[in-house]
Amino acid sequence: MTTGSTNAVGLSAGRRWLIVVVSLLVTASAFIFINGVAFLIPALEEDRGTPLAEAGLLSSMPSFGMVATLILWGYLLDRVGERVVLTVGSALTAGAAYAAAHMHSTIGFAAWLVIGGMAAASCNSAGGRLVSGWFPPEQRGLAMGVRQTAQPLGIALGALVIPEFAEASKSAMHALIFPAILCAVSAVLSVVAITDPPRKEWDEATAQELANPYRRSWVLRRIHAVSALLMVPQTVTVTFMLIWLIANYKCSIVLAGGLVTLSQVLGAVGRVLVGRWSDRVGSRLRPVRIMSVAGVLVLAGLAFADHLRSSIAVPLMITASVVAVLDNGLESTAITEYAGPFWSGRSLGLQNTYQRLMAAGAPPVFGGLIASHGYPPAFVVCGLFPLLAIPIVPARTLPPGLETRARTQSFRRLRRWITFRSGDWPDGTPRPGPLARRQRLRRRGKAVAPPT
């Protein structure tokens, strides 16, 4: 299975990381636009009397637009590279955001949100091959983790700036001038700083390198399914956290926006740490399964705490928001590694299409559920999605280039478990304590009296 270049030909480490940082900034600007309407929901309710379900639908418009073009951008990515795609996509997103900011009708506003989402899809697909092409396997988890902080950092900045911008403006929609400016700057940065990684030309590639990876196994399909299911908690927490804090816990817009920003910054740090963790254990997908289990537990706790109106509900919401964003970088890294350099763009486009379908459908569905039954039942339903993802994760599949490291880690875990079960230290000396003594007696076949 081809994974692209494994060394940075002609580029220093600093130059490679600069490319990752620029890719991060470009993608973060796009996500400020994609998720920006969610932070306009309080202003839309107050200024225009927009119902929560309708406001949730408006916040989904960029996602609907992304669904229409993600695979197309992925195809262009495989053909022309990241530099062109990021530049053109950022420029088009800037134009659409500026036009949406000056719309007075809801229909016109929604239409430009869809068009902007179609353009912003370019930034969502691009960047993965920059990591797989410029970084060796043992650094890709960390590099992709840094690159994938774009979404939570973009959302954090949007949560901090857009509600204040909307409150200070005559129209809530004028707040979208902020992402329009950022996307215009991003287009310039892409031209100046992005360098596409080296790879063979299409006519020089072997038949195996050009072969459809979906015909070889179900691994990519399972990763797509998992990432789509785990997108629901991420979308629900991002969309409704601000209004939930304001309506249910009487937070001011400044405080609520600050808490959303805090959760996204923590999520960004978490993505980097989880990416590094995946490099160390030699697996991208085993941590994803652990994150799925954590998501189920946290959302169940949040539903219960919110039902009781407990003060612990707010930190649980922050925790749920953090856990919900941790997995995405691992799945994107796995896609680029398994799909190879000639299919990674289309594979990421397909994965992001499934994610955006869930992201587009979740806000109006959960907005209606919240309006009719309240937040606790909505959180319970939201927790079912990571629960469904747990058995689908192909956790035993090892990334190309890290098989030896993964097997070494498995051997070390087995050796630690055997040592623990034996009741001795690794050098053979007995461990102190009643538990170790019972383990030694059990190993020798002697009866062990229950503790009193």
Task: Locate each region found by the language model.
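Extracytoplasmic gate region of multi-pass secondary transporters
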Residues: 37-39, 219-264, 268
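Conserved MFS/SLC helix-loop-helix module at the cytosolic interface between two early adjacent transmembrane helices
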Residues: 68-104
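Helix-to-loop junctions at the C-terminal end of transmembrane segments
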Residues: 69-81, 271-283, 370
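Cytoplasmic membrane-interface "Motif A"-like loop-to-helix N-cap segments
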Residues: 79-89, 280-293
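Cytoplasmic helix-loop-helix junction between adjacent transmembrane helices
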Residues: 112-151
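Helix-loop-helix hairpin linking two adjacent transmembrane segments in secondary transporters
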Residues: 146-194
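Flexible cytoplasmic inter-helical loops of multi-pass small-molecule transporters
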Residues: 192-213, 401-413
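C-terminal transmembrane helical hairpin of 12-TM major facilitator-type secondary transporters
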Residues: 285-331
